Swiss-Prot record:
Alphabetized UniProt keyword annotations: Electron transport, Heme, Iron, Membrane, Metal-binding, Photosynthesis, Thylakoid, Transmembrane, Transmembrane helix, Transport
Cross-referenced Pfam families: Cytochrome_B
Biological process (GO), any one: photosynthesis
Key word DNA damage present: no
Cofactor note: Binds 2 heme b groups non-covalently with two histidine residues as axial ligands.
Identification of the protein by name: Cytochrome b6
Entry similarity comment: Belongs to the cytochrome b family. PetB subfamily.
Record-annotated disulphide pairs: none
Assembly mode: The 4 large subunits of the cytochrome b6-f complex are cytochrome b6, subunit IV (17 kDa polypeptide, PetD), cytochrome f and the Rieske protein, while the 4 small subunits are PetG, PetL, PetM and PetN. The complex functions as a dimer.
Any one Gene Ontology cellular component term annotated for this protein: plasma membrane-derived thylakoid membrane
Gene of this entry: petB
Regions crossing the membrane: 35-55, 93-113, 119-139, 189-209
Amino acid sequence: MTNSSPVYDWFQERLEIQAIADDVSSKYVPPHVNIFYCLGGITLVCFLVQFATGFAMTFYYKPTVTEAYSSVSYLMSDVSFGWLIRSVHRWSASMMVLMLILHVFRVYLTGGFKRPRELTWVTGVVMAVITVSFGVTGYSLPWDQVGYWAVKIVSGVPAAIPVVGDFMVELLRGGESVGQSTLTRFYSLHTFVLPWLLAVFMLMHFLMIRKQGISGPL
C-alpha cells in the first residue's frame, strides 16, 4: 500500500489521473521501432523552440515598414542575447523543415500512409504546407531588400490562377502593391493564424497516432 498526498487524492477522485498516467506510460511500442521513428518528435521539439524564441522576439519587433528592419537590428545588436534568440529561431526553422522532410520520407517508405492511417497522412501533409508557409511569411518580416522582393514575388504567384488570381493577390498584399498592409498580413499569419492552425492539426495528428498506434514494418 502506498501513501498518497491529499492533493493527489483530490485530483484522483475527480479526474482519475492514475488511469491517465498508466495509459500514457504503458503504451505498447513495436519492436521494429528505431531512431528514425523519432523524426516526428524532433520536428515537434523544433516547433516548440520556434514558438518560444518567436514569442521572445515579439517584445522587440515592430511590424511597420519604417521600423521593422531597425527593430531587428536593435534586437541583434543591443538586446542582451537577442542575437542568440534570433539565431536559434532561424536555425531551428531550418532544422524543422529538414526533420519534416525526413519524417515524410520515413513514413512513406515504411507504408505509414496506408489504411487505416490515411487521415493521419493527410493531416501530416497539411502540417507540411503550414510549415512551408511559416518560412514564406517569416522571411519577409525583417523587411530588408531580400524580404521585400521575396514578398513581392510570392504574393504575385496566385495571379496565374484563373478567375480568382487577381483577388488572391490583392488579398495577400492588402492592396494593389506591396506595402504596410502586406507586412501586417504576413505578420498576423506568421504569429497568430499559422501557429493556431498547426496546433490544431498537430493535436489531430497525435490523437490519431495514439488511437491507431505506430504502423508495422513492411
